[in-house]
Design a protein with these regions (language model features):
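Extracellular glycan-associated modules
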Residues: 1-236
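Surface-exposed beta-strand/loop patches in extracellular or lumenal glycoproteins
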Residues: 402-407, 459-466, 473-477, 484, ...
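C-terminal beta-sandwich/jelly-roll accessory domains of carbohydrate-active enzymes
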Residues: 555-678
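Extended, loop-rich substrate-binding clefts of extracytoplasmic carbohydrate-active enzymes
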Residues: 318-389
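Beta-strand-rich recognition/accessory modules
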Residues: 251-252, 260-264, 453-574, 651-675
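Acidic (Asp/Glu-rich), glycine- and aromatic
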Residues: 365, 385-427
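Beta-strand-rich N-terminal accessory domains
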Residues: 236-313, 458-487
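Secretory/extracellular carbohydrate-interaction modules
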Residues: 80-88, 268-272, 330-339
Length: 678
């Protein structure tokens, strides 16, 4: 037995009431130490342990009750990290600003260290060996002796030592804290070191059997302690975190919901029951606007692979780092709402500010106080085709807008979700080329393009490991390049693709942190397309492109590409109607009724192979409250999966929205006959 000199012991078996709070029992002194934040009691190595949430959990022992020692001491604990911390995270610490006291914990890669103040110098002793996350319990211990120095152990074995001598400068007026730093640290592995702010986080995982001795245990005693308390089952009761489950109804339409991620993360959010929007389709995929990605639209495949995107990014003024939706960690500015939701289409509005991680909005006007904001409208059709129409309310000379990004679950790297032959690009002429990330597919400098690029590209596909794959259609003049940061942000030892974990879902104040392990949700940017933007009459920048999911080959999407960019002429043959335009913003023909007569509409589309009509949509303004019967080349179609209509509410008589499933490469006559609706 090695309990001689034991001065504090938290077995973490249970919590007890302590006034209005909860407490854990320190059994040597039979004392109650308050536990703060969100936590769970789970199976430990012996009896129970405490699952710390990674955000708020900490056990506090008041300074007056904490063990006081001027010389030798030992600390030990059993831990099972769910994820590595953002930087060093204390298992036990009683220190002041790294000037007094001691700190015992693990770092962002799972190294174990004892740090302390010796003769007013902060000394660190850290292992080269790492404790694993998710898969195994680890026993960690460290000893200090004022003559011999520091020794650190993992699973009973010495893994690091530092010869040093001197007087321990004890932080006697500071509370002892378990599971959380007393001195906040910025995240490690930052992309931009100047965007470095102290982060508030706790240990993320299970802590059990915490002990402090007022003497140095020998190596033999540390091994005995490990063997005596070693559990029969070394795998801790941890489950891999998964992105939200998405209900599939098999019916096209949008709905508000509150998507669940994992309990500790969900607990943070001060939101109601309907913050998120999910769009269902007959096919087994989804489009998802979730607060965990700050409400950008995610394309989610039939097997649960997520692809997100960038927002408008840019601006200056009194801001630090990137100003974009990713920096709005708590969604203080970003929100979504459903504008249209009928059988023919869904329209979702996303509004957000271009802010930094301190929530400062970029390029604030000194007179009005308004900075950079953006509105985006996603017009979504039953075939999985959506138009992203963006309006950037800013006066800066330029903004980026899109970076198709693979979102990786904990336990995954990008290679688990996308093939190394990651991108296929095409143009209207049918030139097609696939690019591999086995080696970077271009020179690799910031903003540099592909080797052997496709000329005048307007179509690309991400080659996900799924049946349905994300695709994008752009207007002429778009430059499609590999991720714009190039190899500067690539860590080849980790992945073929640049990968970060400051976004999504993360709550740390960081605009860029490299993923060091597959312990958290991470994102891997694949492309940085640059679609054209133009100033509208108000001076706002405006643009659009198509994004969607399809199980077709890229060559089979070229007709859709041609339709959006070179839609066939529409000619009114019958009825008091006027053609306004083909709107790329809505991916639809806009037709207006000229007077209040409730008559039929007949028109032709002059379709051809160069100018086809692929699953066309029509918005008939002022149609009224009635439905419609459709004839195509004289043949009547009943409302079904191939002919859908719905109404768009407006101040004036309702507008009719019609969608047809079909590909037309020859002229076609279409009739819409009013039908009274009951």
């Amino acid at each position: 037995m090695c309990n001689g000199g034991l001065v504090a012991y938290w077995n973490m078996d249970r919590t007890v009431a302590f006034g209005d709070e909860k407490a854990v029992i320190e059994s040597v002194n039979n004392r109650r130490d308050v536990i703060h934040g969100h936590f769970k009691i789970v199976d430990g190595v012996s009896g129970k342990g405490i699952k710390f949430d990674g955000f708020t959990t900490r056990v506090i022992c008041k300074a007056s009750d904490a063990p006081h020692f001027k010389g030798a001491f030992t600390v030990e604990a059993w831990i099972a990290p769910q994820a590595y911390p953002w930087n060093w995270c204390a298992i036990i610490n009683q220190e002041e600003n790294h000037e007094k006291g001691y700190f015992f914990g693990i770092d962002e890669l799972g190294h174990v260290g004892l740090h302390l103040s010796l003769d007013d110098e902060w000394i660190q002793c850290t292992t080269k060996k790492r404790v694993p996350f998710m898969t195994k319990w680890s026993h960690i211990a460290a000893t200090f002796d004022e003559e011999e120095g520091i020794t650190v152990y993992i699973d009973g074995m010495e893994e690091a030592s530092l010869s040093c001598s001197g007087n321990l400068c004890f932080a006697e007026n500071t509370d002892l804290q378990i599971g959380r730093n007393l001195t906040l640290l910025p995240p490690a592995a930052l992309v931009r070191p100047h965007v470095s702010f102290p982060a508030s986080y706790s240990f993320d995982g299970i802590i059990d059997e915490v002990k402090i001795y007022d003497r140095k245990l020998s190596a033999k005693e540390v091994m005995e302690s490990y063997l005596r308390s070693k559990p029969k089952i070394m795998r801790p009761p941890l489950k891999w975190r998964k992105l939200p489950k998405l209900p599939h109804t098999g019916k096209f339409g949008a709905f508000y919901t509150k998507l669940k991620f994992y309990e500790e993360w969900d607990e943070l959010w001060r939101v109601g029951d309907h913050p998120d929007v999910v769009v269902n389709f007959e096919e087994p995929f989804h489009m998802v606007f979730w607060r965990g990605t700050n409400f950008n639209m995610n394309l989610v495949t039939e097997n649960g692979r997520w692809v997100g995107d960038q927002s408008a990014e840019g601006g200056g003024g009194e801001v630090i780092g990137c100003c974009e939706h990713m920096s709005d960690k708590q969604c203080r500015y970003a929100h979504v709402r459903i504008i249209e939701n009928n059988d023919a289409r869904v329209v979702v509005h996303w509004r957000y500010a271009l802010c930094d991680v301190l929530y400062n909005i970029s390029s604030k006007d000194p007179v009005t106080g308004w900075g950079n904001w953006a509105d985006e409208y996603y017009t979504i059709y039953p075939d999985g085709v959506a138009v992203r129409h963006f309006i950037i309310h800013g006066r800066d000379p330029g903004y980026s807008i899109t970076e198709p990004t693979v979102i990786n679950q904990p336990g995954e790297r990008a290679e688990d979700n996308i093939f190394l032959e990651a991108v296929t690009i095409a143009n209207l002429e049918g030139d097609i080329r696939t690019y591999s990330w086995e080696n970077w597919p271009g020179p690799g400098g910031v903003g540099e393009g592909f080797y052997n690029p496709v000329s005048n590209p307007t179509l690309c596909m991400l080659n996900l490991k799924s049946r349905y794959k994300p695709f994008y259609i752009y207007e002429p003049g778009t430059r499609i390049i590999p991720y714009g940061g190039g190899v500067l942000e690539l860590r080849r030892e980790y992945s073929h693709f640049p990968t970060w974990n400051h976004w999504p879902v993360s709550q740390i104040p960081s605009d860029g942190r490299y993923a060091l392990a597959p312990d958290r949700v991470s994102s891997s940017a694949i492309l940085s397309p640059m679609p054209p933007m133009r100033r509208n009459e108000r001076g706002d920048l405006e643009g659009r492109f198509i994004m969607g999911l399809s199980n077709k080959k890229i060559e089979d999407l070229i007709p859709l590409n041609r339709f959006w960019l070179n839609s066939p002429e529409l000619e009114i043959l019958k009825g008091n109607f006027v053609k306004e335009s083909f709107s790329r913003d809505e991916h639809a023909y806009i037709i207006r009724r000229e007077n209040g007569e409730n008559g039929a509409l007949e028109f032709t589309l002059d379709a051809s192979e160069d100018s086809p009509a692929v699953n066309p949509a029509f918005v008939i303004k002022g149609w009224g409250y009635g439905g419609a019967k459709m004839r195509i080349n004289g043949e009547t179609l009943k409302p079904s999966g191939n002919f859908r209509f719905g109404h768009r509410r407006s101040v004036n008589p309702r507008d009719l929205v019609v969608w047809i499933r079909g590909e037309f490469i020859e002229p076609v006559k279409i009739s819409l006959i009013p039908v009274e609706m009951t």
